[in-house]
């Protein structure tokens, strides 16, 4: 599986996940508007007043 990942040029770098990493995630700090994207072995979806985290299991779904 591939996911987008944040890098020096923004969050557009595509990476291939390891066999153990079955989730793509998109994590957003709602206060600072910073975001992180990548692969994960486990993932918990969160939507609170200050944090949003989306998990997905298909290629390049964390845009």
UniProtKB/Swiss-Prot annotation:
GO CC annotation: extracellular region
Source organism, top-level taxon: Eukaryota
Main location (coarse class): secreted
Keyword annotations of the record: Disulfide bond, Neurotoxin, Presynaptic neurotoxin, Secreted, Toxin
Tissue spec. comment: Expressed by the venom gland.
Gene3D superfamilies the record matches: CD59
Compartments it resides in: Secreted
GO MF terms held by the record: toxin activity
Stretches that traverse the bilayer: none
Protein's UniProt keywords contain Secreted: yes
Pfam families found in the cross-reference section: Toxin_TOLIP
SUPFAM superfamilies xref list: Snake toxin-like (SSF57302)
Cysteine pairs bridged by disulfides in the record: 3-24, 6-11, 17-39, 43-55, 56-61
InterPro entries: Snake_toxin-like_sf (IPR045860), Toxin/TOLIP (IPR035076)
Record bears the keyword Protein transport: no
Similarity comment: family membership: Belongs to the three-finger toxin family. Ancestral subfamily. Orphan group XIX sub-subfamily.
Its biological purpose: This toxin is described as enhancing presynaptic acetylcholine release, but neither experimental results, nor references to other sources are available.
Protein name: Bucandin
Source species: Bungarus candidus
